[in-house]
């Protein structure tokens, strides 16, 4: 089940936070709820990816990319993910998630995300290769970055 309540809550919170520059970091705070856990009473790996999806969504809202995507008729997709699980997040534990775009090449925009425990330990860390598409296929990141308002010259 997709966490629609969490999505709505995060969207409301993100709308009340200051706008981010394109390469700034979105920080959100979460709890590991019973519906997030696996049989070992810790955050399920699949739910981790879902929470990262929510973090990227809020990043696009706060940075203004969501408006650019809507205006241009573009969509975003994850083309690849590399994730490292380092520490367990147990049921009811609080954690912080950080999401930021870190760069791009001629086809992809790269996003870094991490979940951090209250004691400062990195619970998991992901590097995502994302792509912006339109009806004709992949949109060049330079075009996206320019529409997003970042001067790349």
What is each stretch, according to the model?
Residues 36-38, 44, 86, 90, ...:
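Generic, ordered loop/turn and secondary-structure boundary motif
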Residues 1-77, 134-153:
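Hot-dog-fold acyl-thioester-processing enzymes
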Residues 59-103, 125-130:
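Hydrophobic beta-strand-centered segment that forms part of the acyl-chain substrate-binding groove
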Residues 1-16, 89-96, 100-153:
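HotDog/MaoC-like acyl-thioester-processing domains
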């Amino acid at each position: 089940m997709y966490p629609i309540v969490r999505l709505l809550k995060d969207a409301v919170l993100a709308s009340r936070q200051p706008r981010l520059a394109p390469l700034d970091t979105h920080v959100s705070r979460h709890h590991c709820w019973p519906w997030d856990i696996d049989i070992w009473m810790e955050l399920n790996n699949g739910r981790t990816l879902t929470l990262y999806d929510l973090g990227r969504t809020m990043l696009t809202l706060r940075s203004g990319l969501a408006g650019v995507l809507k205006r241009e008729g573009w969509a975003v997709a994850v083309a690849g993910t590399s994730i490292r699980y380092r520490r367990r997040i147990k049921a009811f534990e609080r954690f912080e998630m950080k999401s930021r775009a870190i760069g791009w090449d001629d086809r992809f925009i790269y996003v870094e995300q991490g979940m951090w425990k209250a004691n400062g330990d990195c619970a998991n860390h992901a590097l995502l290769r994302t792509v912006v598409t339109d009806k004709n296929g992949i949109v060049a990141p330079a075009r996206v970055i320019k529409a997003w308002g970042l001067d790349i010259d």
